[in-house]
Amino acid sequence: MDFNAVNAAAEGYREDMVKFLRDLVKIPGESAEEGNKIARAKAEMEKLGFDKIDIDPQGNLLGYMGSGEKLIAFDGHMDTVGIGEMSNWKFDPYDGYETETEIGGRGTSDQEGGIVSA
């Protein structure tokens, strides 16, 4: 597989991925209260043309694309821990920040950035 071709194709999604991640950061979602994050992710899956999207009784978002003998699965979580004392933050954790090389905010490294990348 040509890494440069894959990387070039991925670059075409950068703007949409950044917007999706920034949207997720802005939505509070502590454990068992991440329903609004799930709704935003579901909307993104619909936009991307997933064949089937379900939310199970536990609130897990399940998306399906394609068919075949082999299955590729991705498992992640969107809940976050509380922000604690706002005065301890150098930036608003629910607004986050963006530079040329990074996006910061509540949940970006655990695990919303990975979910957006998948």
Where does each model-flagged region fall?
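Active-site alpha-helical elements of protease catalytic centers
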Residues: 107-118
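Acidic/His- and Gly-rich active-site-bordering loop/insert found
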Residues: 2-108
